[in-house]
């Protein structure tokens, strides 16, 4: 069965200000705009006069917004996460990414390998099956940052106690960007 979800509706920003008109940010914006126009970008720039953000201070709200962005994406989804577990939120997030990929959306995922650590054999099996589903999908690109050669808990513990450079070389980014238009950052 197909689930139909409402399209993403941009919330009113809690804080907005006019776009920069001088200084380095204005120059960067002008350069990016000129480059996009050179490449034939047909993006609607009707909201180009403002920039803003909305604080999402509750985990439940942040998850709902992430799912809404995933559900509304039509072209691309880019994610970077330090932690990605096979808990209920991780399973929901993964299922929505798979649904988006089924709609033809290109999904790119980068996960820090330390953040994929499973604490039980059942969690490891679920994590690996989720990963296999995503890797097999033609519209999903899944990459592990600083991956460990050992997949098990003891093997990883050994690696981390003997290789301090790997232990301290982490990707702690947390972001989701839909259609290069809206981004959620943070945990």
Regions found by a protein language model. Name each.
Residues 15, 26-27:
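N-terminal, Lys/Arg-enriched amphipathic/low-complexity engagement segments
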